[in-house]
From Swiss-Prot:
Annotated function: Part of the ABC transporter complex GsiABCD involved in glutathione import. Responsible for energy coupling to the transport system.
Protein name as annotated: Glutathione import ATP-binding protein GsiA
Gene name, Swiss-Prot/TrEMBL: gsiA
Keywords recorded for this protein, A-Z: ATP-binding, Cell inner membrane, Cell membrane, Hydrolase, Membrane, Nucleotide-binding, Repeat, Translocase, Transport
Assembly behavior: The complex is composed of two ATP-binding proteins (GsiA), two transmembrane proteins (GsiC and GsiD) and a solute-binding protein (GsiB).
Length: 623
């Protein structure tokens, strides 16, 4: 039954007294309490708060997806104005009616793209299916529109990507596919749950601008769920701050940033890492720990030098990793993705080397190739003086005790059938390191170190938020006391306060045990805080590498400068340069089979600071 007289003028969505709970061991656990808000047509409402504060379950409740997961939802009012201007009460819609509402009138970009995309269908089919269902388009028309949407979200070789499967794409590319799918039907309301978490800063800037452009064209209301206050400052009109399932403050973006009233809001803003905060400092520095009771910043002491002189613990020389692309009636390999091309670097005990670059630049593939999770076609990988790229699988398994990996997608890397205690204890069992009671005590200690409770060991992955699942993955990686940890976007899914705690934990472990980190990230403020050295990757090659201070304070390569310039700043009044969308052809690392790409030539421009000389392929970086 329509409720056209109950929506205020200009509103496209209105929620009153939303309560969400889950049953656990015959006990009702409240996740959201008495939440009320509205969204105007053409407005962006940012919902911010810590991991587990109720942001994502609120979004799932609006999409009517919680009932299937056992969620108990009660609400006085949940009104939506559809694209046809009809106003409906979402809580009264049947499952069949909601299938027509989702996608056409309300769309959602989910936090974890690997678990949101169907692994058995090509991404082009998945985007086209939504277009066919909601726009009555033919298959051919839908595929043309799907290709156009992939172009819009800055995916190179979009025509090729249409026929690829989710597991064949990087995390950032999967996230862009999700964004393309959500925007393809031009909904009245877009709910974006951490949509730029897996994206590098340059693509993030493009996506934020794309959302704003489409929002203006369609007068689309946007609910933007994020923990990145820089993104909030850039995109939001109003901000809703949530803490422990309740709204503690709401107001315009200027009010929240310049005159926050609630202690938690002030603490949240104080914990935001600022690019440039490490200027003049040579070594990594702990994040200030911010509490609700004491939101004032207390600068911690500078970290002492942890890098051990002598031989590197890990040495990589001319690493090459390529993936075949098949085509034609005979399904022959005709082209290859040059994911990693002649990459070389050293990693010393106690050092953090950060790999930064765009999604698809080869960062994650480099990390996976070091553990032989993907096979390389050339180069040498030497760990503690021993070549590991030629080891047998049996010897390689023993070596993995000393090199651990923290994956980008926490839900996909945890077994949904195992409790998280079993997931953390599994490496200890595989390597036969600790008996039962000692292993259980180790699990409890690890959970506490990453900000969780020992009793959480009996829960399953689906019972945690995205940020909490990432903490579980970090605890699992730390279980074996490894010498090297490869952290692939290990803190990208965490809110600012927990992110600071995890970075401080990693620094403490590095100081105490001499762990070396290969830190793969697109968060330049975090990279600046944790790194000893930084390597910038572009199209599978390192184009700049050197001490963190030199790279951040005196970037030499135009791509490095572009990365730093694209970092969002937590200041809503700051003027941002307008970026031209799709102003040029996107470069690609896909080449004909057998075609060799010239390796960039690195030149020394300072102590330990090497830069590739700009070539024609970097011309697209002009501002």
């Amino acid at each position: 039954m329509p409720h056209s007289d109950e929506l205020d003028a200009g509103d496209v969505l209105a929620v009153e007294n939303l309560n969400i709970a889950f049953m656990q061991e015959q006990q009702k656990i409240a996740a959201v309490r008495n939440l009320s808000f509205s969204l105007q047509r053409g407005e962006t409402l940012a919902i911010v708060g810590e991991s587990g504060s109720g942001k994502s379950v609120t979004a799932l409740a609006l999409m009517r997806l919680l009932e299937q997961a056992g969620g108990l939802v009660q609400c006085d009012k949940m009104l939506l104005q559809r694209r046809s201007r009809e106003v409906i009460e979402l809580s009264e819609q049947s499952a069949a009616q909601m299938r027509h509402v989702r996608g056409a009138d309300m769309a959602m970009i989910f936090q974890e793209p690997m678990t949101s995309l169907n692994p058995v269908f090509a991404v082009g089919e998945q985007i086209a299916e939504s277009i066919r269902l909601h726009q009555n388009a033919s298959r051919e028309e839908a595929m043309v529109e799907a290709k156009r949407m992939l172009d819009q979200v800055r995916i190179p070789e979009a025509q090729t990507i249409l026929s690829r499967y989710p597991h064949q794409l990087s995390g950032g590319m999967r996230q862009r596919v999700m964004i393309a799918m959500a925007l393809s039907c031009r909904p009245a309301v877009l709910i974006a749950d951490e949509p730029t978490t897996a994206l590098d800063v340059t693509i993030q800037a493009q996506i934020l601008q794309l959302i704003k452009v489409l929002q203006k064209e369609m007068s689309m209301g946007v609910i933007f769920i994020t923990h990145d206050m820089g993104v909030v400052a850039e995109i939001a009109d109003r901000v809703l701050v949530m803490y422990q399932g309740e709204a503690v403050e709401t107001g315009s973006v200027e009010q929240i940033f310049h005159a926050p009233q609630h202690p938690y809001t002030r603490a949240l803003l104080a914990a935001v890492p600022q690019l440039g905060a490490m200027k003049g400092l040579d070594y990594p520095r702990r994040f200030p720990l911010i509490s609700l009771e004491h939101p004032a910043k207390q600068e911690p002491p500078i970290e002492q030098k942890t890098v051990v002189d002598g031989e590197p613990v890990l040495r990589v020389r001319n690493l090459v990793t390529r993936f075949p692309l098949r085509s034609g009636l005979l399904n022959r390999v005709t082209r290859e993705v040059h994911a990693v091309e002649k990459v070389s670097f050293d990693l010393w005990p106690g050092e953090t080397l950060s790999l930064v670059g765009e999604s698809g630049s080869g960062k994650s593939t480099t990390g996976r190739a070091l553990l032989r999770l993907v096979e390389s076609q050339g180069g040498e990988i030497i760990f503690n003086g021993q070549r590991i790229d030629t080891l047998s699988p049996c010897k390689l398994q023993a070596l993995r005790r000393d090199i651990q990996f923290i994956f980008q997608d926490p839900y996909a890397s945890l077994d949904p059938r195992q409790t998280i205690g079993d997931s953390i204890i599994e490496p200890l069992r595989v390597h036969g390191l600790l008996p039962g009671k000692e292993a259980a005590a180790r699990v409890a200690w690890l959970l506490e170190r990453v900000g969780l409770l020992p009793e959480h060991a009996w829960r399953y992955p689906h019972e945690f938020s995205g940020g909490q699942r990432q903490r579980i993955c970090i605890a699992r990686a730390l279980a074996l006391n490894p010498k090297v940890i490869i952290a692939d976007e290990a803190v990208s899914a965490l809110d600012v306060s927990i992110r600071g705690q995890i970075i401080n934990l990693l620094l403490d472990l590095q100081r105490d045990f001499g762990i070396a980190y290969l830190f793969i990230s697109h968060d330049m403020a975090v990279v600046e805080r944790i790194s000893h050295r930084v390597a910038v990757m572009y199209l599978g090659q390192i184009v700049e590498i050197g001490p963190r201070r030199a790279v951040f304070e005196n970037p030499q390569h135009p791509y490095t400068r572009k990365l730093l310039a694209a970092v969002p700043v937590a200041e809503p009044s700051r003027q941002r340069p307008q970026r031209v969308l799709l102003s040029d052809d996107l470069p690609s690392n896909i080449h004909l089979r057998g075609e060799e790409v010239a390796a960039v030539s690195l030149q020394c421009v300072g102590p330990g600071h090497y830069v590739a000389q700009p070539q024609s392929e970097y011309a697209f970086m002009r501002r």
